[in-house]
Swiss-Prot record:
It catalyses: 7-aminomethyl-7-carbaguanine + guanosine(34) in tRNA = 7-aminomethyl-7-carbaguanosine(34) in tRNA + guanine. Homodimer. Within each dimer, one monomer is responsible for RNA recognition and catalysis, while the other monomer binds to the replacement base PreQ1. The gene is tgt. Binds 1 zinc ion per subunit. Residues 245-251, 269-273 are annotated as: RNA binding. Its cofactor is Zn(2+). This is Queuine tRNA-ribosyltransferase. Catalyzes the base-exchange of a guanine (G) residue with the queuine precursor 7-aminomethyl-7-deazaguanine (PreQ1) at position 34 (anticodon wobble position) in tRNAs with GU(N) anticodons (tRNA-Asp, -Asn, -His and -Tyr). Catalysis occurs through a double-displacement mechanism. The nucleophile active site attacks the C1' of nucleotide 34 to detach the guanine base from the RNA, forming a covalent enzyme-RNA intermediate. The proton acceptor active site deprotonates the incoming PreQ1, allowing a nucleophilic attack on the C1' of the ribose to form the product. Pathway: tRNA modification; tRNA-queuosine biosynthesis. It holds the Pfam family TGT. InterPro entries: ArchSynthase1/Queuine_TRR, TGT, TGT-like_sf, tRNA_ribo_trans-like.
Length: 374
């Protein structure tokens, strides 16, 4: 992978990630394909929304279908018929989300399978091996996602263990002679000094890109913005910056304003299945009865298949009847909305008009523009 930085507007960056399997224009949003599929969508449909890269989930793909079946197909690209770049998370976040059915030690994590209760162990080395089997274009290190809230001491211990796991991830990645890219993950909760220590340690090890982890886990938005403003300028300019698990459209806008290059989140797809649709004028809840006889499209400014062909009334009807097509059309729209937002952000950075773009984004939704720190 090669990262090319074209231009900046304030702290925002316009560039691209160049892989053998294709180029990803940045800032980029990655739809989430947890089980090797973006729910309800074919790869062709996902691509038609403008997505250049997908995120796959190491933990879930390891449990089902497993490495052996994956290898029989070649890798995850062949298994799901997506021949463009794929980033896989390390599995750490999912393991730590298991709560009472897992035990964390220095070696790794012991847990019971949420599928059948089987005892399983995952560590940094196993995570690297699974992601190697998946053929991931971007591999993420195995880390502990520090829960929120955490005291300074709790966050420090968690971050320092993540650093030790980061070195083990690097060593195993190199031992496997994996030709793809490895990203480090900056931890430290909401504490700037711990974020500094984490980044310093990761830079000493050396990675192809750097993610900011442990945000959007319940902390106030002000803390997320503060940490991004503190951390992003310290990441080398020639390395991509990835904000993990984020988020709402405004979170993407605020992340880009603070120098983030990559995002992922289940929100556009999950919300689509629940009838929450993102538009240029804010969120539409298609289950609301006021859409029952509305012949207008979801969003007159959207060029997606759904908006070009169907009315709000039809989408309301599909939702009320619990028709699968409704969830699919909603997903197509939400994913396209996210990609159009990223296209708009990239264009604004190119032309030096990001401030105007951001103001229009918030004004159209009747909201004020959040302030950046000096």
């Amino acid at each position: 992978m090669k990262f090319e930085l074209d231009t900046t507007d304030g702290r925002a960056r316009r560039g691209r990630l160049v892989f053998e399997r294709g180029t990803v224009e940045t800032p980029a949003f990655m739809p989430v394909g947890t089980y090797g599929t973006v729910k309800g969508m074919t790869p062709e449909e996902v691509r038609a929304t403008g997505a250049d890269i997908l995120l796959g989930n190491t933990f879930h793909l390891w449990l089902r279908p497993g490495e052996e079946i994956m290898r029989k197909h070649g890798d995850l690209h062949d298994f799901m018929n997506w021949q463009r770049p794929i980033l896989t998370d390390s599995g750490g976040f999912q393991v730590f989300s298991l709560g009472d059915i897992r035990k964390i030690t220095e070696e790794g994590v012991h847990f019971r399978s949420p599928i059948n209760g089987e005892k399983i162990f995952m560590d940094a080395e196993k995570s690297m091996q699974i992601q190697y089997s998946l053929g991931s274009d971007v591999v993420m290190i195995f880390d502990e996602c520090t829960p929120y809230p955490a005291t300074h001491d709790e966050a420090r211990k968690s971050m320092q263990m993540s650093l030790r796991w980061a070195q083990r991830s690097r060593d195993e990645f190199d031992r496997l002679e994996n030709p793809n890219s490895l990203f480090g993950i900056i931890q430290g909760s909401v504490y700037e000094d711990l974020r500094d220590e984490s980044l310093k340690g990761l830079l000493e090890i050396g990675y192809d890109g750097y993610a900011v982890g442990g945000l959007a886990v319940g902390e106030p938005k002000e803390d997320m913005h503060r940490i991004l403003e503190h951390v992003c300028p310290q990441i080398p300019a020639d390395k991509p910056r990835y904000l993990m698990g984020v988020g709402k459209p405004e979170d993407l806008v605020e992340g880009v304003r603070r120098g983030v290059d990559m995002f992922d989140c289940v929100m556009p797809t999950r919300n689509a299945r629940n009838g929450h649709l993102f538009t240029s004028e804010g969120v539409i809840k298609i289950r609301n009865a006021r859409h029952r006889d509305d012949t207008s499209p979801l969003d007159a400014k959207c060029d997606c298949y759904t908006c070009k062909n169907y009315s709000r009334a039809y989408l309301y009807h599909l939702d009320r009847c619990n028709e699968i097509l409704g969830a699919r059309l909603n997903t197509i729209h939400n994913l396209r909305y996210y990609q159009m937002l990223m296209e708009g952000l990239r264009g604004a950075i190119e032309t030096g008009t990001l401030d105007a773009f951001v103001e229009e984004f918030y004004t159209s939704q009747g909201r004020e523009v959040p302030k950046l720190s000096d």
